[in-house]
């Protein structure tokens, strides 16, 4: 039976991204809530972040700066995911992106999705009218809408190689 590690502490600050605005979510970011309005863009860098409630409205956009690199978001609250992912290779994005839901609140994923969701205590509602999803999903109950297509992509982040040069 899958179990969750302890939920990270959630800060008391909230972040909203409005029309024509963008924000870069980066390693160690921590928000009580994050909302991206229609026309707003969320750039996501590799790392590990913690968010209470997340709401990505229809018409919002997401761009992974380094698709495939390990990117984990810990959630501890409600999830509404209606955004469009701007990256071309959604399979590569899915290999590096994972959400861990620590609460039992229902997660609604209506927009494009690429990544794994680990939410053993939460219900998942996936896909709406001809949406395509890439990744793996674990939830208490999972509902997949009739027009959704899911492609199995394992969480298997790419490794960043570093080259060190020495001079004698």
Where are these regions (language model features)?
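Long, polar low-complexity repeats
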Residues: 16-157, 168
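Boundary/junction segments of secreted and surface-exposed precursor proteins
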Residues: 1-10, 162-168
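Hydrophobic alpha-helical segments and helix pairs
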Residues: 4-5, 9-12, 18, 24
């Amino acid at each position: 039976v899958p179990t969750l590690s302890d939920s990270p502490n959630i800060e008391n600050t909230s972040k909203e991204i409005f029309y024509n605005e963008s924000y870069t979510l980066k390693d160690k970011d921590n928000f009580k809530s994050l909302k991206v309005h229609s026309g707003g863009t969320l750039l996501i860098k590799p790392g590990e972040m913690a968010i209470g409630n997340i709401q990505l409205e229809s018409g919002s956009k997401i761009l992974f700066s380094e698709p495939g690199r390990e990117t984990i978001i810990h959630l501890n609250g409600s999830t509404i995911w209606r955004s469009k992912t701007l990256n071309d290779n959604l399979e590569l994005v899915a290999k590096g992106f994972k959400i861990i839901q620590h609460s039992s609140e229902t997660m609604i994923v209506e927009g494009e999705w690429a990544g794994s969701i680990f939410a053993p205590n939460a219900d998942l509602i996936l896909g709406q009218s001809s949406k395509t999803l890439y990744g793996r999903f674990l939830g208490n109950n999972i509902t997949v809408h009739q027009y959704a297509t899911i492609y199995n992509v394992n969480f298997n982040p790419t490794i960043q190689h570093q080259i060190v040069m020495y001079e004698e």
